[in-house]
Amino acid sequence: MDSADPQLNRFLQQLQAETQRQKFTEQVHTLTGRCWDVCFADYRPPSKMDGKTQTCIQNCVNRMIDASNFMVEHLSKMNGGHV
């Protein structure tokens, strides 16, 4: 099979895009689960989300994203800029 085959290249691009979507979805589920545990410690969400809970979830997600970005940058520096 020739690596310059346009169909193969399209397939590989689609496969890469799907893999990225799956990783993103997995990240969202992970963040949701962790922040749920932090912000709803009794495992019972209120019937209506109040300002305190909404702020908790926003702060939790933001901290998780910050931590993830920090780790990516740190690992990138350790690899000499190659992630």
Swiss-Prot record:
The keyword Mitochondrion applies. One of its GO terms (molecular function) is metal ion binding. InterPro entries: Tim10-like, Tim10-like_dom_sf. It holds the Pfam family zf-Tim10_DDP. A motif (Twin CX3C motif) lies at residues 35-60. SUPFAM superfamilies: Tim10-like (SSF144122). It is found in: Mitochondrion inner membrane. GO terms for cellular component: mitochondrial inner membrane. Its main location: mitochondrion. Disruption phenotype: Worms display mitochondria with an interconnected morphology, presumably due to defects in the assembly of outer membrane fission/fusion components. It is a peripheral membrane protein. GO terms for biological process: mitochondrion organization; protein transport. Keywords: Chaperone, Disulfide bond, Membrane, Metal-binding, Mitochondrion, Mitochondrion inner membrane, Protein transport, Translocation, Transport, Zinc. Disulfide bonds join C35-C60, C39-C56. Mitochondrial intermembrane chaperone that participates in the import and insertion of some multi-pass transmembrane proteins into the mitochondrial inner membrane. Also required for the transfer of beta-barrel precursors from the TOM complex to the sorting and assembly machinery (SAM complex) of the outer membrane. Acts as a chaperone-like protein that protects the hydrophobic precursors from aggregation and guide them through the mitochondrial intermembrane space. Heterohexamer; composed of 3 copies of ddp-1/tim-8 and 3 copies of tin-13/tim-13, named soluble 70 kDa complex. Associates with the TIM22 complex, whose core is composed of tim-22. Belongs to the small Tim family. The twin CX3C motif contains 4 conserved Cys residues that form 2 disulfide bonds in the mitochondrial intermembrane space. However, during the transit of ddp-1/tim-8 from cytoplasm into mitochondrion, the Cys residues probably coordinate zinc, thereby preventing folding and allowing its transfer across mitochondrial outer membrane. This is Mitochondrial import inner membrane translocase subunit Tim8. The gene is ddp-1.
